[in-house]
Amino acid sequence: MRHILLILLFCSSTVFASFDMNERMQKTYTHILNLEFDIAKELLHVESNKNPNNGIIILNENYIDFLTILINEDQSYYSNAKDLKIDRLKACKEKDKNSPYYLYVQSEIYLQWAFCHLKFENYTIAAYEFIKAYSLLK
């Protein structure tokens, strides 16, 4: 009986940890908003080593790309980062579906990419991304 209880406890803790907005992730977010991407990337690296299943890592990585694209207006960076979006969304879908962050993170990624597509005048794709973001949250 104890073994079953320990297994259930372990499994539930890993499920709930799939989206963990812990102190390190909050600091990362603050550094991203301050455009201190190098510091944010270091914190993301630490979090990836300590808590590799944390879905908030995916969101914060996407924030870095989103702001880099909007600020630098670099077409090649934009083109390369589009592939990362697909990988990030796939990774999000493997996380805890019962978490309140599950749909939010996916929607936020779509919304950020909608603005990136607008920046480079890809209006049709941007509209699709806006609709996708909205449909996840309604």
Please report, for each region that a protein language model flagged, where it lies by residue:
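Terminal low-complexity, poorly structured segments
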Residues: M1-L5, A40, G55
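Bacterial Sec-dependent signal peptides at the C-terminal "C-region" and cleavage site
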Residues: C11-M21
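Short coil/linker segments at helix-helix boundaries
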Residues: F19-R24, T28-L43, I58-K138
